[in-house]
């Protein structure tokens, strides 16, 4: 019987053929926690009586949400993870010394391997499917179970095939493609499904765009997002010191898909998701008619804080200034990305344009710090969620967009089209 990539990954892990809808218990290749979710997992771990991690090298803690600590409470919370990491001599512990947002840092470190089953106590763990792995977010107690046993159970998800065809026009990126998918199927259109992204348009999408695609699978309710390994993936992996040998899986022709969605990307304009759902997508042409003044622009996050995003923003910002009434905050996703941006002269461009460049952190995205919105303020953001109060006051508004739209809007002081600057 024909299988999808996701079914093949689970079959390989349990060592017999499995299909969508079946319940399986499987080993976990990588377990990921952060400074917010791991303390709960640690408490459950200790309450169980466990003394040792089942697979220490397959457990990573990435301190990224409130690091450096924003207040005493977050400092005490971070201390729980630090103490645990030091007690267990954790190999994959990433703090200020080597910091970054977990879903950018893990692939950068070679800790995501094609064919893996990965779980993380963070909903955007689905990002790692861009490297041909099954990767999904779970709760902190689920994480604790994997810490103790090295395993977890799943219902093998059915798959929705998303086929992108055509060549994307200028300033169309993975962010626009996934916002269009969510616009079409809604925030629950892929509930507990694997979103498999494919089609001839994939050859035009670099790894950064692919990470954006898979990152926001959860915003359509998806259990995971996944992309088969190709030459672009292999080129990315060649520069990484992978922790294990990759296993490449490909869907069989004739595999069973619950739904097939076909999108001609050549017809897409940049997409902006209006408040208060990622499914409220509008084309930039529609958005321009609203002539919306913007108070803040944020470029960063695990969705769009990678080097290509910073390069895109820098090309638009070079020689220009952020609008008088608008703030621009730029947050590189990892220290390595920040260093590369500095070496390329991007930091000079940002500062000269009037931007504030912060350390890597999830802070602004979740309304934690480093970019919180006040009452009634509007923000164009390259993040992944725009729910009520997501980035600050409940009356504030977040408009999700790609990095080019964000940079152009910072200059104009309102939602702007980067193609006409």
From Swiss-Prot:
Keywords: 4Fe-4S, Amino-acid biosynthesis, Branched-chain amino acid biosynthesis, Iron, Iron-sulfur, Leucine biosynthesis, Lyase, Metal-binding. This is 3-isopropylmalate dehydratase large subunit. SUPFAM superfamilies: Aconitase iron-sulfur domain. Catalyzes the isomerization between 2-isopropylmalate and 3-isopropylmalate, via the formation of 2-isopropylmaleate. It comes from Campylobacter fetus subsp. fetus (strain 82-40). Pathway: Amino-acid biosynthesis; L-leucine biosynthesis; L-leucine from 3-methyl-2-oxobutanoate: step 2/4. Heterodimer of LeuC and LeuD. GO terms for biological process: L-leucine biosynthetic process. One of its GO terms (molecular function) is metal ion binding. Binds 1 [4Fe-4S] cluster per subunit. [4Fe-4S] cluster binds at residues 302, 362, 365. Its EC number is 4.2.1.33. InterPro entries: Acnase/IPM_dHydase_lsu_aba_1/3 (IPR015931), Acoase/IPM_deHydtase_lsu_aba (IPR001030), Aconitase_4Fe-4S_BS (IPR018136), Aconitase_4Fe-4S_dom (IPR036008), HAcnase/IPMdehydase_lsu_prok (IPR011826), Homoacnase/IPMdehydase_lsu (IPR006251), IPM_dehydratase_rel_enz (IPR050067), IPMI_cat (IPR033941). Belongs to the aconitase/IPM isomerase family. LeuC type 2 subfamily. Its cofactor is [4Fe-4S] cluster. It catalyses: (2R,3S)-3-isopropylmalate = (2S)-2-isopropylmalate.
